[in-house]
Structures are given as C-alpha cells and as structure tokens.
C-alpha cells in the first residue's frame, strides 16, 4: 500500500490473547488475500517469534496460534469525496508541539524512550527478559536531575537490571523502581489488550504538552 498511488487506508488493529483483529477502510487496489501471513511476520519482526514463544509459553502471545479476523472494507464514497478533493478525513486530534530539547520533545519523554529502546534491544538477546516494556522518567524541574526512573519489564526469574538502567540513562537517578507491583510475567496481549489509537496517543506525547 505504501507504494501505490491513490490508495487511501485507515486501519485499526486490536490484539487480545492470540487474536489479531484488523478493522477499517481502504480505497484502491490492495491484495489482502495473505493478510494472516503478513500479521504473523509483523509479530516475528518485533520479536514475538517461535523462539520467544518457546521461552515464554503461556505468558505471552504465541505466533504459532494466531487467529486473524479481517474486517477491512471499502472506503465510503461519502468520505472519499472529501479526502480526494479537500483533504478532509476523520484522523482524530493529537496534542503536542516541538519544544527545546533532544529530538524536539520534552526531556522526560525522550529519556523514557531512550531507556525503553535500550531495554528492548537487551531483552531481545535475553532468555529471561520479555519485550513488553514500559518506562517512565520524572525530572526535578529546578535542577534537571532525574528523580525517578520506573521500569516494568517481564522477568521469568528475578534479575537486577538497575545497573543497566543507570548505564542506559548515563546518570544515576535518585530512585529506580523495577516492577514495583511485584511479579511481572504475563504480558503482551495475553495480559493487556492493545488498540492502535490508544497506543499511538500515548506514544506521541503521553497526552500532555510540556
């Protein structure tokens, strides 16, 4: 779809347990006959492959048992006439604007993403750490110091990752909290249903502007 002129597509994805549901509208010639293979390959690409399933078993989504529900239809002619000529569409509203700081986003979000990326790459080579990682950074506005670094990362067995957190951030936070609720083993869509729009809104600016 990315390389086909004139194609419009608005597709949402919802994942729960081992079920992936695709819903939305498409205008143009798009071959969706092998959509199940595409979905499974996308899961493998982000790390949820057969090897991962062998390690985590029932704790995470299993690419070998994926059910794909395809509810992608044809774009409404009423909507298309506005999109085609005037650019109208129902795309929702996201908050956020460029600000002074790394990557033109607020420093807390930048550091949280940096830490998340580092942990994700580390987890991909680990037989104990999972890929469903959440991070949050709190900064003292007066000093710029990191007050708290919070990490939620699946672990089959307890593991001290605080030294890795410090190394990834390049500084020692006053407090590091890892899996503060206790055990974190069930993860991915097995534990938390994911919907495209909700996840994107959180990823852009965490619904708040600096």
Residue spans for each PLM region:
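Cofactor-binding beta-sheet edge motifs in enzyme active sites
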Residues: 13
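Glycine-rich, mobile lid/loop segments that gate access to catalytic sites or pores
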Residues: 9, 17-20, 30, 37, ...
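Catalytic palm subdomain of template-directed nucleic-acid polymerases
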Residues: 23-26
């Amino acid at each position: 779809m990315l390389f086909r002129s004139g194609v419009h597509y608005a597709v949402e994805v919802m994942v729960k347990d081992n079920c992936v549901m695709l819903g939305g509208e498409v205008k143009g010639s798009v071959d969706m006959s092998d959509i199940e293979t595409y979905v499974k390959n996308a899961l493998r690409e982000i790390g949820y492959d057969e090897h991962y399933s062998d390690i985590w078993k029932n704790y995470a989504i299993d690419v070998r048992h994926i059910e794909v529900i395809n509810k992608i239809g044809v774009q409404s002619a009423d909507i298309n006439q506005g999109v085609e000529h005037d650019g109208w569409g129902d795309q929702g509203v996201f908050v956020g604007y460029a600000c002074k700081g790394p990557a033109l986003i607020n420093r807390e979000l930048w550091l949280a993403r940096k830490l998340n990326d580092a942990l994700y790459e580390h987890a991909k080579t680990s037989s104990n750490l999972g890929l469903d990682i959440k991070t949050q950074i709190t900064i003292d506005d007066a000093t710029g110091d990191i007050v708290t670094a919070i990490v939620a990362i699946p672990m089959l067995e307890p593991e001290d990752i605080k030294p890795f957190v410090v190394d990834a951030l390049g500084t020692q936070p006053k407090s590091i909290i890892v899996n503060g609720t206790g055990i974190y083993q069930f993860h991915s869509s097995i534990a938390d249903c994911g919907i495209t729009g909700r996840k994107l809104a959180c990823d852009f600016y965490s619904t708040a502007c600096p």
